[in-house]
Amino acid sequence: MIEIVHSLPTPHDAVRAAADGAGRLIPPLWPLASSVAVNPFLGHTGEPLWAAGARLGRASGAAVTMPRSWYRDRIAAGSITDEDLLDALADAPADLRPADLGALRGAAALDPEPVRPLPTVASLCAEASGIDWPGLIADRLGAWAAGHFDEGQALWAAPSGGSTLALWRAWAIHDLTPEIAGLGGFARHVSEVPDGALPALARAVCGLGLSPGALESYFHQILLSLGGWAQYARYKLWQAELAGGTDGTLRDLLAVRVIWDEALLTRYGERIAESWAAVAAAHASPARPTRDLVIDSILQDAAERAAQRALAATLAATLAGGSPGVGESRPALQAAFCIDVRSEVFRRALESLDPGIRTLGFAGFFGLATAHRRFASDIAERRLPVLLNPGLRTCAGGPALSDADHASRLAARARRAWGRFRQAAVSSFAFVEAAGPLYAAKLLGDSLHLGGPATPHDPMPRLDPPRDLASRVATADAVLRAMSLTSTFAPIVLLVGHGANVVNNPHASALHCGACGGYSGEVNARLLAQLLNDADVRAGLRERGLEVPADTVFLAGLHDTTTDEVTLYAGDLPGGSPLQGLEPVRVWLAQAGKLARAERALRLPRARDNASVVRRSRDWAETRPEWGLAGCNAFIAAPRHRTAGQPLHGRAFLHDYDWQRDEGFGVLELIVTAPVVVASWISLQYYGSTVAPELFGSGNKLLHNVVGGIGVLEGNGGPLRAGLPRQSVHDGEHHAHEPLRLSVLIEAPRQAITDVLERHREVRALFDNRWLHLFALDQDGRMAWRYAGDLRWTSTAASDGAVPGLPLRAAV
């Protein structure tokens, strides 16, 4: 029997504050059906990299930068120069940085001691007993959580109808594994836990002898040890708060794990008392950055400055080449793509085919934040940035397709019933014997890459319920102005969303559009095309001073980023008659796809030619069908002619923006607070999965097992893994992603940018604490000003000391 020795009770308010504070340090994990890139440092953006490194190192032992050898190689190769090192050194905290360049170079030549996390109660008990308590806890919690959080994968649903803590207690009192392993009386201990997470946590931390000052650090370490389970609970809280509510799952899950420590300390307390007292005292002290952490952060900053120099040279080459600005002549074709870095390669290829082709970059949800129901489905897919709530409700099809809708629903039910029959406990054995040979053809086809999913072609989406004309006109006006597309319209304007068609890939949705919430972007593109082709909407736009020529047609498309093929939704056009001039557009798109595939093949392992790139999307054994957004390191908001024709190698998010058309700088504010933040999440997810793969990566794709439709395990057990697989950032020999924090370049008056930062403290924190770098471009498109933090700017060398740059303030 376990007896609890209570110390002085800890007030519930202190426990609540510490639990909530620790929970905010955990990034959310979206389920696999709509997985989006998440900044793993989301809770640390209020502190610089070295401070986050101190906190994470103490809790998990994770690094926040690359090994020193990675920087040494770049210094030796000359890509990181002495100037980069000196500039980074000058920006580091004076009390911990090396004295001069020589001292920094000397420090870079030495490898620091590995970061060791504080021991946990479970790890101390494992040392004392020889029993792998951390592994056993992860196994038992995972076994329960897989059923509790299941989103439809399991054949039998776990019990529901209570809090997460209550449901775990009901399960745990019948689980004899801990007692068999040596934790006698565990079931009784669980049965005596107070109802509610706060009372349970308060009792447990008293038993653990933790002071109020130690709680947040201890809770943070516990939540990190839960891996993706804690992150999924954080997602539930995120979604609840976005809807104006709250959710207690994360706090309950924390209580579940702390109850284990409470029981273990009671069982092994005498043997680990001294060690645990030292750990508890360490949790109560601040996590202070070490000199090595600051040195590593300086080296990281220097690597980023080297990349910024290269980018500045690329932009200067555009200027030196005399690249013309956008003229007044009418283009033959305009094509708006998502700002996704994969679009940059295709856009450059398309523009190279004809001087009359112009492309634009805009967030891939095209300004339409919609909750969409696909054909014959009642599931509302949130096709919008996860920072936002849907403002529209849409569906595919309409009353005229009710018979087809009914037939599709019946077919879907039959498929689900057949699938459950195949997987059921009893029938699965007979199924393999009786029906297994019927799958020989499918097995052969999949092995020969003959099958695979097709691009979805749902019926044309529509607003449900419809919006009044004034609302539709206002939406169309806002979107066109945000795209800086207000004049010189081409006869055909493509609105191209993007998605990826791959097979046998649990993380397939991560290759879709991040701005569309992890879904492909054709729905939003088709909706906007309908809106802009509406004659009544165009008349309303005319009254607002925005004239769209009568012969201009907006046509939606979908860019498959795996094959670089573009599907056009010409069937959505009003009237049903063939569109004049469409055939040359199809030819251009096919040629651009061929050029883009040839460029991408140079980076893809074993990609020999165009055909092999396409074949990868149907290969069920291919762990790298495409590189996704690996390599991303810049975000540029400027007119397209600043970057046109320059090889950015699929590393830059490109958002069209003309500040002189942005009266009041509302579009600038939208860009800085939405697309820039989404891009930062993507960039920092790739960064975290590269520098700290054990903490922020999902491991080896070859070992993945999908759990509950939520995430993956690496192997047959252990914690839920979040983040990117190793194959998404590494080619087997070298890193495919260079972990650099994003450099944001904006062509706008500095004061306008400063005003936006001043109004949005959370966004400003990203730049003040160097999770993002910020530059203002001058009137020639050069990187003339660097944001120095605290709403200050410093001149850079990019303008050779002679160019005054854009005005501090816009002319009135």
Curated annotation (Swiss-Prot):
Broad class of where this protein is predominantly found: membrane
GO cellular component: plasma membrane
Family stated for the protein in its record: Belongs to the inorganic carbon transporter (TC 9.A.2) DabA family.
Gene Ontology molecular function: zinc ion binding
Keywords: Cell inner membrane, Cell membrane, Membrane, Metal-binding, Transport, Zinc
Subunit details: Forms a complex with DabB.
HAMAP family (alphabetical): DabA (MF_01871)
Obligatory cofactor(s): Zn(2+)
Gene: dabA
UniProt protein name: Probable inorganic carbon transporter subunit DabA
InterPro entries named in the record: DabA
Positions that bind Zn(2+): 338, 340, 498, 513
Role noted for this protein: Part of an energy-coupled inorganic carbon pump.
PANTHER family, A to Z: INORGANIC CARBON TRANSPORTER SUBUNIT DABA-RELATED, UPF0753 PROTEIN AQ_863
Subcellular locations according to the entry: Cell inner membrane
A Pfam family it matches: DabA
UniProt membrane topology term: Peripheral membrane protein
Residues making up the signal peptide according to the UniProt record: none
Domain of life: Bacteria
